[in-house]
């Protein structure tokens, strides 16, 4: 099922997202503590004439991990090479990437927790000693060839930090957990982006979109792009509050940022009446894979206190019952009459 609020777990930014991407910490809205710390570490590395230590970003998708990697490269005045762990199937794939890096380059690996143990073994000496160990042959006749690599900064990104092996995680000099964005931060992002798109939002419209964007910039920008279409076909020079509400309702995104998949998820838990349900049971009921449920659907519901994870499974919170139980039993849908 296609969802306007869904974010792919492994994806590089679209041309649309790239065109709106900030290029410096000054332009980047949100994640203030992370920006402040990175700014210090980058300035210190440049002052010493060294590469920045390896960096790990983790957190739900769409919060700006890729954007921060690009800003780091910009601030260090170096090139950035992009890849994703599922694309690195063999040690030779990683060797080809590493040997093509230039001195000081940034290597960005998305969903780094999906690297196989064999690939990790190749990566360890590259991260620690900037050296590539290639084994030729097998058994007693096997030989190891050592190839020196240029010094580089590895930036790993993941939505599943708990699945990163301890040896790999220990080799990162710094790690940062990205937080969900406030409505005010998203509203600013939307207003700036709307100007770049040539269809400016008024403040009320930007705030309305922000409230329904699941605290996630990528979703906010996706919603803005679609709302712009509603304004365009109505020959409106600016996106008004009423037009934003109309478009968001038409897209099936309610006032809390929930769509039909979220509501179906919550209905499953509410029908269980506080009886814990396992991830596999919920995924089967939604006809989704477990990874999508855990990485894409649940984080926002957890962060906002609508569900709870227990040792026995997931349950609907008291807040969920208070907020939705009556609405979910109505004949009228959650998306009607917003």
Curated annotation (Swiss-Prot):
It is found in: Cytoplasm. InterPro entries: AAA+_ATPase, AAA_lid_4, DNA_helicase_Holl-junc_RuvB, P-loop_NTPase, RuvB-like_N, RuvB_C, WH-like_DNA-bd_sf, WH_DNA-bd_sf. GO terms for cellular component: cytoplasm; Holliday junction resolvase complex. Keywords: ATP-binding, Cytoplasm, DNA damage, DNA recombination, DNA repair, DNA-binding, Hydrolase, Nucleotide-binding. ATP binds at residues 20-21, 62, 65-67, 128-130, 171, 181, 218. DNA binds at residues 309, 314. Residues 255-338 are annotated as: Head domain (RuvB-H). CDD domains: AAA. It is an enzyme of class 3 (hydrolase). It catalyses: ATP + H2O = ADP + phosphate + H(+). The keyword ATP-binding applies. It comes from the Bacteria. Residues 182-252 are annotated as: Small ATPAse domain (RuvB-S). Its EC number is 3.6.4.-. Mg(2+) binds at residue 66. Homohexamer. Forms an RuvA(8)-RuvB(12)-Holliday junction (HJ) complex. HJ DNA is sandwiched between 2 RuvA tetramers; dsDNA enters through RuvA and exits via RuvB. An RuvB hexamer assembles on each DNA strand where it exits the tetramer. Each RuvB hexamer is contacted by two RuvA subunits (via domain III) on 2 adjacent RuvB subunits; this complex drives branch migration. In the full resolvosome a probable DNA-RuvA(4)-RuvB(12)-RuvC(2) complex forms which resolves the HJ. Has 3 domains, the large (RuvB-L) and small ATPase (RuvB-S) domains and the C-terminal head (RuvB-H) domain. The head domain binds DNA, while the ATPase domains jointly bind ATP, ADP or are empty depending on the state of the subunit in the translocation cycle. During a single DNA translocation step the structure of each domain remains the same, but their relative positions change. The RuvA-RuvB-RuvC complex processes Holliday junction (HJ) DNA during genetic recombination and DNA repair, while the RuvA-RuvB complex plays an important role in the rescue of blocked DNA replication forks via replication fork reversal (RFR). RuvA specifically binds to HJ cruciform DNA, conferring on it an open structure. The RuvB hexamer acts as an ATP-dependent pump, pulling dsDNA into and through the RuvAB complex. RuvB forms 2 homohexamers on either side of HJ DNA bound by 1 or 2 RuvA tetramers; 4 subunits per hexamer contact DNA at a time. This is Holliday junction branch migration complex subunit RuvB. It comes from Campylobacter curvus (strain 525.92). The lineage of its organism: Bacteria, Pseudomonadati, Campylobacterota, Epsilonproteobacteria, Campylobacterales.
């Amino acid at each position: 099922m296609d969802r306007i609020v869904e974010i792919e777990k492994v994806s590089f930014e679209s041309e649309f997202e790239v065109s709106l991407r900030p290029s410096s910490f000054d332009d980047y809205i949100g994640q203030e503590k992370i920006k402040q710390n990175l700014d210090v570490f980058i300035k210190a590395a440049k002052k010493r004439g060294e590469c920045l230590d390896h960096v790990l970003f983790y957190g739900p998708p769409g919060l700006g991990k890729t954007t921060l990697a690009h800003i780091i490269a910009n601030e260090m005045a170096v090139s950035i090479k992009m890849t994703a762990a599922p694309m690195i199937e063999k040690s030779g794939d990683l060797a080809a990437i590493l040997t093509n890096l230039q001195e000081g380059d940034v290597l960005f690996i998305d969903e780094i927790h999906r690297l196989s143990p064999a690939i990790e073994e190749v990566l360890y000496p590259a991260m620690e000693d900037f050296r590539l160990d290639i084994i030729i042959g097998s058994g007693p006749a096997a030989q190891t060839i050592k190839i020196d690599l240029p010094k580089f900064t590895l930036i790993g990104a993941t939505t599943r930090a708990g699945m990163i092996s301890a040896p790999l995680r220990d080799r990162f000099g710094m790690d940062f957990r990205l937080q969900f964005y406030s409505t005010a931060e998203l509203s600013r992002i939307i207003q700036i982006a709307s100007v770049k798109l040539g269809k400016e939002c008024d403040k009320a419209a930007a705030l309305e979109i922000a409230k329904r964007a699941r605290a996630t910039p990528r979703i906010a920008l996706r919603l803005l792009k679609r709302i712009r279409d509603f304004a365009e076909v109505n020959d409106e020079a600016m996106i008004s509050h009423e037009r934003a509400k109309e478009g968001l309702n038409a897209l099936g995104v309610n006032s809390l940022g929930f769509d039909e998949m979220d509501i179906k998820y919550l209905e499953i838990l509410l029908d269980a009446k506080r009886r814990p349900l396992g991830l596999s049971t919920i995924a089967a009921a939604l006809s989704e894979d477990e990874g999508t449920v855990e990485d894409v659907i649940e984080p926002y519901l957890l962060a906002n206190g609508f569900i709870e994870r227990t040792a026995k499974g997931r349950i609907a919170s008291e807040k969920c019952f208070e907020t939705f139980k009556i609405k979910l039993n109505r004949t009228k849908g959650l998306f009607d009459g917003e």
